[in-house]
Amino acid sequence: MAAKFLLTILVTFAAVASLGMADSVLLSGQTLYAGHSLTSGSYTLTIQNNCNLVKYQHGRQIWASDTDGQGSQCRLTLRSDGNLIIYDDNNMVVWGSDCWGNNGTYALVLQQDGLFVIYGPVLWPLGLNGCRSLNGEITVAKDSTEPQHEDIKMVINN
């Protein structure tokens, strides 16, 4: 079981490295600080100084976490349990994906199609169809063939 998980992680990171995706990936335990961004093609995901997480396409805002004004000098962190969190400068949670599981290796990827996806091990038992965020439902997709209608996806390894 552990060998299968390790192989999955190695394949995931080899793919990320070979595609030159360093600017579009945030790994578990890493932080994106206020004013910094992930970029993929025409899309940019920025954590702003006012704590708003915003996705842009060609410089035009197309999605936001609606957390502006809820703190200052915020940062976006992908925790080792898979939970994506915006913290303010007092380490208070401003926004979170509220999806987490066992500690593991996860990767937030801003894809070429503009979706930002969290890849990693299974976070919940079968039958649970989604996780709540602080501002709405996060669509969970088991694989890349399922319909994608939201901006955030949780992709799990079977």
From Swiss-Prot:
> Mind listing the GO biological process terms from this record?
response to other organism
What glycosylation sites does the entry record? 103
Domain called Bulb-type lectin: residue spans: 23-131
Q: Which residues form the signal peptide?
A: 1-22
The GO terms describing molecular function are: carbohydrate binding
Supply the CDD domains for this chain: B_lectin (cd00028)
**What cystine pairs are annotated?**
51-74
Q: Write the record's keywords in alphabetical order, separated by commas.
A: Disulfide bond, Glycoprotein, Lectin, Signal, Taste-modifying protein
Q: Which InterPro entries match?
A: Bulb-type_lectin_dom, Bulb-type_lectin_dom_sf
Query: Which residues form the propeptide in this entry?
Result: 136-158
User: Any keyword Glycoprotein?
Assistant: yes
Assembly mode: Heterodimer with curculin-1; Disulfide-linked.
Summarize the protein's role: Taste-modifying protein; sweet-tasting. After curculin, water elicits a sweet taste, and sour substances induce a stronger sense of sweetness.
Its protein name is: Curculin-2
